């Protein structure tokens, strides 16, 4: 068994740019010779195959209860023990978990991201770095609108209704308060190259300390 992997947690509101930051860190650390993977909390939305579509479409994806957090924590702990996992895949158009899974191998660096990543103390306790990506509400909404239409088969009206009904209020109730747990706050998400440079250098320094 090798050294303990470095675990970096990145959170922020939907459309904040946290996944852009996460993927850029994976790319840079991989280019530098470290193995790095991205594990997304979104993959662990609960299976809803036992519910009719009329109920699935009402799911509040921005509430802590929408995630199978026990499985997420279990898989993260397994990766920390240098064990491979079978990561769930979420089928957004059908609002449930896909039948397929994705094999994920352990790595030197595990980057985890998600809107409610810091909400559970079991997850926070496993993170060596905790990063909050802080982006203006209007920018986050416009990014989410574009993403959900292009990638998830949503309608403009559906995205707007969901944002006003759950996304915005849940952000202020559950996401923004977890900013206090962050070691580092990154404004402007993936466009903040200075911050990404700093995060990359900090991760490299922590790897050397291992």
Curated annotation (Swiss-Prot):
Pathway: Pyrimidine metabolism; CTP biosynthesis via salvage pathway; CTP from cytidine: step 1/3; Pyrimidine metabolism; UMP biosynthesis via salvage pathway; UMP from uridine: step 1/1. The keyword Cell division does not apply. One of its GO terms (cellular component) is cytoplasm. It comes from Leuconostoc citreum (strain KM20). InterPro entries: AAA+_ATPase, P-loop_NTPase, PRK/URK, Uridine_kinase, Uridine_kinase-like. It catalyses: uridine + ATP = UMP + ADP + H(+); cytidine + ATP = CMP + ADP + H(+). Keywords: ATP-binding, Cytoplasm, Kinase, Nucleotide-binding, Transferase. Belongs to the uridine kinase family. NCBIfam families: PRK05480.1, udk. GO terms for biological process: CTP salvage; UMP salvage. ATP binds at residues 12-19. The lineage of its organism: Bacteria, Bacillati, Bacillota, Bacilli, Lactobacillales. Its main location: cytoplasm. It is found in: Cytoplasm. It comes from the Bacteria. This is Uridine kinase. GO terms for molecular function: ATP binding; ATP hydrolysis activity; cytidine kinase activity; uridine kinase activity. Its EC number is 2.7.1.48.
